[in-house]
Amino acid sequence: MNLDICKFNLFITGIGNVGFKLFEELSKNRNFYIKNHQIDFVIRGISDSDKMYFNTNGISFENWQHLMKNGEDSDEELFFKKVKNFNLQNSVFVDNTASKKVADTYIHYLKNHIHVVTCNKIACSSDYFYY
């Protein structure tokens, strides 16, 4: 049985230790996810506190660090606008930071039907009413 592959379009902020490990895991296990689960993860945007980089065709697991060096200055609001303008089905904003400022942007993603995945301790321990 040949099933279509479901693509998840990832927009990742925070590419320090946790973000680097995420890239490593996605790169190492990509073929497994495609073959066994018919899921592909395509990274379309990345950012850290200094730079951000987007590519409509996807960002290579092999040279993302080099691409980041040539990215534009990082800005949370502009990052969100670019993610929104991509207008892709199955878009996922991934927050690997410990930033309240980034966590405060989740509402914009969610209101625009963009999934949010986070390990942000500040966001996960904020006021329950907010969530």
Positions of predicted regions on the chain:
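A short, basic/flexible loop-to-alpha-helix module at the beginning of a structural domain
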Residues: 1-8, 30-32, 82-83
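Extended hydrophobic secondary-structure segments that form protein cores and membrane-embedded regions
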Residues: 9-13, 42-49, 93-94
